[in-house]
Amino acid sequence: MPMDEGDAQGSLLLEWKQLNYYVPAQEQSNYSFWNECRKQRELGILHDVSGHLKTGDLIAILGGSGAGKTTLLAAISQRLRGNLTGDVVLNGMAMERDQMTRISSFLREFEINVKTFTAYDDLYFMSHFKMHRRTTKSEKRQAVSDLLLAVGLRDAAHTRIQQLSGGERKRLSLAEELITDPIFLFCDEPTTGLDSFSAYTVIKTLRHLCTRRRIAKHSLTQVYGEDSFATPSDNGSSGSNSIEMEIVDNSHESLLQAMKELPTLGVLNNSPNGTQKKAAICSIHQPTSDIFELFTHIILMDGGRIVYQGRTEQAAKFFTEGFMQPKNCNPADFYLKTLADGQGSKNAGELLRAKYEHETDGLYSGSWLLARNYSGDYMKHVQNFKKIRWIYQVYLLVIRFMTEDLANIRSGLIGFGFFMTTAVTLSLMYSGVGGLTQRTVQDVGGSIFMLSNEMIFTFSYGVTYIFPAALPIIRREVAEGTYSLSAYYVALVLSFVPVAFFKGYMFLSVIYASIYYTRGFLLYITMGFLMSLSAIAAVGYGVFLSSLFETDKMASECAAPFDLIFLIFGGTYMNVDSVPLLKYFSLFFYSNEALMYNFWIDIDNIACXVNDEHPCCQTGLEVLQQASFRTADYTFWLDCASLLVVALVFHIVSFTLIRRYINRSGYY
């Protein structure tokens, strides 16, 4: 794709030179029973790939399966981690990963959204993270309305994402990436899973975003009616649905034709990059002829190398030498079939690649240097962008978690019903435990242990499934800089705090009414507080288990050994003096000891039978001593603090593991 001086001036030109990407490959030894002896070698995915993209271009990356389309897309966009070499520059300026994420967006092949949100709520929520911190709420709402109009989702604005069609979800994902009004759009298989019409609509939307030229705002009420558009105000600001469109010239017919093609031509009115065209590059698999014609340029890949890169209409000329395209044949299908077919001793891909390398030798001569000052000014403008503060990120994420819970209220009520059924079952089993006798000492200890276990297991296993399921969203949004990983983690933990206290006291209410009613209201308050702390500590334990594995199945299966070890050290199945140090690693121990201490420490008299052959504990202090629990005055608060410390340790380890995984894997 040669560039002249006119193209370079006033344009943003992204160039990639000699990109090479290797991944480790393992070969299993045939002579080892355990397959422990493995030879490490590197498998090349990209080989000396060079090219460029300028604003106004819509490029399609074509190639067979395994040709390296998605890898090239990720490498150019700086979303790829691993052994990547080569240069990516913007008008001659080297681009780092954080700089690239500020000026570009990446549309994944498969949509990743909070399915319980509506289309409007999803965009409005993301606008808080992706727009400048000083943007007002009214401006955010205006931007969201414009985006919904731009991608043709105005009528589905208040429909839940899980109820949208495949094409609508794809366009919503595109709108979400357009919130920042990026200059460069990287789209990985944007037509996957869509019917021909939906796929055409998505690519057509991208085409208009890339080729638009801004015009003055117009009132469209005469064409579409007052209900559809608002007239811009005198000060130049737009109304609720005023738009700007692409036109080819200043003729009246061009404007009317552009209007007829709504809603796929709408763009943000208050775009900070409004005077600058966009550029999009898409990996795409077998596009139809109509879709293929929408692309301004194509890149053909074979075996991790470029076979052809240039304007779409010039590709046919490139392939005419030695290859005959059948009549009425989709050009994209012909090019891909040519690459796949063998031609004599060499395959067609090798022949075409050699021809392309000969024709483009010395093509990339640095014409982007003409616009280097322009890109420098643009990057200064981008770097002045200020995200919302960390504490506000936490607040918004807590709201999102709670909104998800409210949207799934039915499943939440079912789970809560089973939880309370367990409480009723335990209350019936221990309903005969009332007076304080030698026979009831063990019953009370067992019921307290069951309270502790139920809270810990319920919350730990409830959290175990969260991170494996949320990893795709975390990887995308954290890698894109939407919010920090620490904000997400803290918000997740905080969202469980009110749930822990609510469930803790509700569960205890059923048990307390049938067993401990003679002890008064203060005991109810303190026991509920301890159960809630146990639940909070269990959240840390569950997140720890979840962070060790990438799948919820592995996390649940491997949790059993941890549960067994910590449970044995809890003080019921084994005297804690038998494990003087190991008990301090068990949250079951702290929870059980605190509950037992809180119940028994004020008991001064326990009846002893006259002919009882077993040891008789006459006070609550003796009950605690028999179980080898601590009896100091500070035991209650020490155990409370210990539960929080255990939770903190689990969270620190979990956060470290998750951050390491995110940094290692990146966007993919």
From Swiss-Prot:
Q: Which GO terms describe its cellular component?
A: plasma membrane
Query: Do the record's keywords include GTP-binding?
Result: no
| Residues annotated as domain ABC transporter | 31-328
Catalytic activity entry? guanine(out) + ATP + H2O = guanine(in) + ADP + phosphate + H(+); riboflavin(in) + ATP + H2O = riboflavin(out) + ADP + phosphate + H(+); (6S)-5,6,7,8-tetrahydrofolate(out) + ATP + H2O = (6S)-5,6,7,8-tetrahydrofolate(in) + ADP + phosphate + H(+)
The way it spans or sits in the membrane comes to: Multi-pass membrane protein
Family annotation (PROSITE patterns)? ABC_TRANSPORTER_1, ABC_TRANSPORTER_2
Keyword check for Membrane, yes or no.
yes
Membrane side Extracellular: residue ranges: 434-453, 512-524, 583-637
Q: Which Pfam families match?
A: ABC2_membrane, ABC_tran
- Which residue windows are transmembrane per the record? 413-433, 454-474, 491-511, 525-545, 562-582, 638-658
Assign the protein's first listed, main location to one coarse class. Answer: membrane
Q: Which UniProt keywords apply?
A: ATP-binding, Membrane, Nucleotide-binding, Pigment, Translocase, Transmembrane, Transmembrane helix, Transport
**InterPro entries recorded:** AAA+_ATPase, ABC2_TM, ABC_transporter-like_ATP-bd, ABC_transporter-like_CS, ABCG_transporters, P-loop_NTPase, Pigment_permease/Abcg
What Gene3D superfamilies does the entry give? P-loop containing nucleotide triphosphate hydrolases (3.40.50.300)
Q: Name one GO molecular function term.
A: ATP hydrolysis activity
Report residues binding ATP.
Answer: 63-70
Tissue and organ expression note: Expressed in eyes.
Functional description taken from the UniProt entry? ATP-dependent transporter of the ATP-binding cassette (ABC) family which transports various molecules including bioamines, neurotransmitters and metabolic intermediates. In the eye and probably in association with w/white, required for the transport of the eye red pigment precursor, guanine, into pigment cell granules. In Malpighian tubules, involved in guanine uptake. Probably in association with w/white, involved in aging-induced intestinal stem cell proliferation in the midgut by regulating tetrahydrofolate transport.
Q: Which family does it belong to?
A: Belongs to the ABC transporter superfamily. ABCG family. Eye pigment precursor importer (TC 3.A.1.204) subfamily.
Assembly and partners?
May form a heterodimer with w/white.
Which PANTHER family does this UniProt record tie to the protein?
ABC TRANSPORTER G FAMILY MEMBER 28, PROTEIN BROWN
What name goes with this protein?
Protein brown
